[in-house]
Amino acid sequence: MNRWAILAGFGMLAGSTQLLWLTYAPITTQVHQAMGVSEGAAGDLAGIFPLMYVVLALPSGRWLDARFERALSAGAILTAGGGLLRLAGPSSFGWALAGQFVVAAGQPLVLNSITKVAARYFPAPQRTAAISAGSVSLYVGILAAVLSGGPLLHAGGLRLLLTVQAAVAVVAAAWVLLAVRTPAAFGGDPSVSVSLRWLRHDRFMWVLAGLLFVGMGVFNAVATWLDTILGHFGRGGAAGYLIAIMTVAGILGAAVVPQAVAARDRRRALLQVTVGVTVVVFAVISGLHPVGFVAVALFAEGFVLLAALPVVLDWSELHTGPERAGSAVGFLLLAGNLGGVVLVLVVQGVIGNPYLSLGALSLAGLAGLVLSTRLPAHVAGGTSAASTGQRRP
């Protein structure tokens, strides 16, 4: 199968994991009424995903490094299977929860494959673009979930919504199951150990993990609490559109920024700009909160914040090599999902005061800015697995 067709199928599957993750998030009120559970329980249908990721990230990454075809195939089957399982009882909380657990178990196997797919099927000059495309697919899935949930629910209830999403997941899974039968065009070094011991003393990877902790944490906190924060200023009704604007900006940023910074070897500069913008944006929003201004500010934030993920993943693959790419991404996304849980809880603790809530987001960005100074200015500064700072072909 052509490498771009493989990437397209993988992107569809990766987007499907986000689509299924956030199925119930935009329609929490309707879900709790239809299923006869509390709004908190309805919210748990999405909340289990980051917790499952924290538990499964490292073993999933190690399995991908050792048996890529089997591991990614399992992720595809679990994603499609979970989507179908929810159709057993569209209005049943029990079936919904069971399906979400199955999808959540498959998600790390899919998302940890982003750099592995790029390394196996793409030549070195195209890998940054392939990693960017894989990352963009995640944001497209998030946006699709946010924008389609309400209309599909109103058009045909939960059954129509779940059927459409299951169909997307099944097609994507079938595509990937065919794609993984294609032999790797670029093999790794079989002598490299897939043990996780190397992570313990790899300071570079810990710094990248800290930055993803901040970045994904900020995004999750904004997505969770923006409505409540702006509600204190009388503008809560605009939160859904503002989050969509932030996500669209991120799709644009992730599509163009990683290749540009990789070509100029300016990865650290981009990450420093990202956390710097985070500090400024939320500090300024606390003082200026007209909807138009907030939209512009969040567009700028989304453009750099969501573009930072493929930059970090690309840098990690360059640093570790393709043999350990699954474990590396698993470790980084574990940190990111943990950040999502922690920062959501931190903001929740001060949610009664919008200034403290926005200040917490700015402080998180400031911590990331300090952390970013520990990165080398350029890849050739000695962090890369290849001494030249260039990818092995």
Residue spans of the language-model regions?
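Extracytoplasmic gate region of multi-pass secondary transporters
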Residues: 24-25, 204-254
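A late C-terminal transmembrane helix in Major Facilitator Superfamily
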Residues: 317-353, 361
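Helix-loop-helix hairpin linking two adjacent transmembrane segments in secondary transporters
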Residues: 133-181
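Cytoplasmic helix-loop-helix junction between adjacent transmembrane helices
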Residues: 99-137
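C-terminal transmembrane helical hairpin of 12-TM major facilitator-type secondary transporters
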Residues: 267-312
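Helix-to-loop junctions at the C-terminal end of transmembrane segments
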Residues: 56-68, 253-266
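Conserved MFS/SLC helix-loop-helix module at the cytosolic interface between two early adjacent transmembrane helices
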Residues: 55-90
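Juxtamembrane intracellular "pre-TM" segments in multi-pass secondary transporters
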Residues: 181-208
